[in-house]
């Protein structure tokens, strides 16, 4: 049923255009009078935002890979319980910037933690909740870095601890996203993030229509 609430997640390297594409989909949902909630991970709740700052800040001691994973999962558990599940139960669509696939990509792909362990913790933190559709904006590491640097030159913002990781880390993250998309192709939409925002939205809308989401 096309009007049923949907949980749509946007994934990709930093600078891939997730925010712009989410904003375009928001406008489409508004035009169709579909109630929606936009949120993000890590964060999405007051406690989650505190955890986000702990993970991403450069100041102070960095968490070990396992600690980092557990912090992400703690934020996710709070987010699912307090925000995502209540919204879905109320019939509201949820658009989320990153979710469980990011933990597989960053903590397993990037940090080399066992994928089985990450998946197990994802399942525990979410209570088994999965995205209906995951939209992957695929972008090369080089282009991701170029866009991040360009953004920083305009805003004056510096890169966070994760963004500052080496290119090899980000390439492993990218390849993990692509691997996940191949293994669950029916639930993933992969877009070439080099395209213009207009083309990307047109492709997304077409894919959502073909899958009877919209």
Curated annotation (Swiss-Prot):
ATP binds at residues 12-19. PROSITE patterns: THYMIDYLATE_KINASE (PS01331). One of its GO terms (biological process) is dTTP biosynthetic process. Keywords: ATP-binding, Kinase, Nucleotide biosynthesis, Nucleotide-binding, Transferase. It comes from the Bacteria. The keyword Kinase applies. One of its GO terms (cellular component) is cytosol. It catalyses: dTMP + ATP = dTDP + ADP. It is an enzyme of class 2 (transferase). Its EC number is 2.7.4.9. GO terms for molecular function: ATP binding; dTMP kinase activity. NCBIfam families: DTMP_kinase (TIGR00041). Phosphorylation of dTMP to form dTDP in both de novo and salvage pathways of dTTP synthesis. Belongs to the thymidylate kinase family. This is Thymidylate kinase. The lineage of its organism: Bacteria, Pseudomonadati, Bdellovibrionota, Bdellovibrionia, Bdellovibrionales.
